[in-house]
Amino acid sequence: DEPTTDLPICEQAFGDAGLCFGYMKLYSYNQETKNCEEFIYGGCQGNDNRFSTLAECEQKCIN
């Protein structure tokens, strides 16, 4: 699937790992908990709700 670009990044699904089998610890905004949380990204596809650092996620998604 293509990234979900029609929704704002912080409203896209939390922790979309994608279809590949890499192992990258990234951060994603979780709308249910209203926090940025760590998840494992597979390295391809998924959506745009993924950030390299907790600070980057919080800066973008937590007001």
UniProtKB/Swiss-Prot annotation:
Q: Which residues form a coiled coil?
A: none
Q: Which domain of life is it from?
A: Eukaryota
Q: Where is this site: Reactive bond?
A: 21-22
GO function terms (MF aspect): serine-type endopeptidase inhibitor activity
* Record key words, sorted: Disulfide bond, Protease inhibitor, Serine protease inhibitor
**Keyword tRNA-binding tagged:** no
InterPro entries in UniProt = Kunitz_BPTI, Kunitz_BPTI_sf, Prtase_inh_Kunz-CS, TFPI/VKTCI-like
> Which Cys pairs are S-S linked?
10-61, 20-44, 36-57
Task: List the GO terms this entry assigns under cellular component, sorted alphabetically.
Answer: extracellular space
Q: Which residues form the BPTI/Kunitz inhibitor domain?
A: 10-61
Q: Which CDD domains match?
A: Kunitz_SCI-I-like
> What PANTHER family does its record include?
BPTI_KUNITZ INHIBITOR DOMAIN-CONTAINING PROTEIN (PTHR10083:SF374), KUNITZ-TYPE PROTEASE INHIBITOR-RELATED (PTHR10083)
What is the protein's known function? Inhibits chymotrypsin and thus avoids the accidental chymotrypsin-mediated activation of prophenoloxidase. This enzyme is required by the insect immune system to produce melanin which is used to engulf foreign objects.
**What is the protein's given name?**
Chymotrypsin inhibitor SCI-III
